Amino acid sequence: MIQRIFYPVGQGAFYSERHENCNIVYDCGSMSISKGRKVVSQRFSKEDIIDILFISHFDYDHISLIEDLKATVKEIRFVVMPLLHHNEKILLFNVSSI
């Protein structure tokens, strides 16, 4: 059985699917960090393993809660990101280093 959840984070995207042996998260963000953090803390725990985290694109309201999710769960095994051109990779690396 598949359990699909659309989390109430306001403007943003944060969904998950729980299969028998696989947990998947699609995007992980919200413009309202307080709403998003509440969802992360209520719906995930240190026992949870996210097998795959899919990121559709890098808008703030799709990625702003990734650090919170990472700090809350035991492990995120794989991250799937959109195809990036060379200049986008450089920009992403430089922004993440700040």
PLM features per residue range, with description:
Residues 1-44:
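Conserved beta-strand hairpin/beta-sheet module of binuclear metal-dependent hydrolase folds
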Residues 11, 58-63, 86-87:
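Active-site environment of divalent metal-dependent phosphoester hydrolases
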Residues 28-30, 58, 84:
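Structural motif
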Residues 35-81:
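Active-site metal-binding motif and surrounding structural segment of the metallo-beta-lactamase
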Residues 72-98:
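Flexible, acidic/histidine-containing loops and adjacent segments that form or flank the divalent-metal
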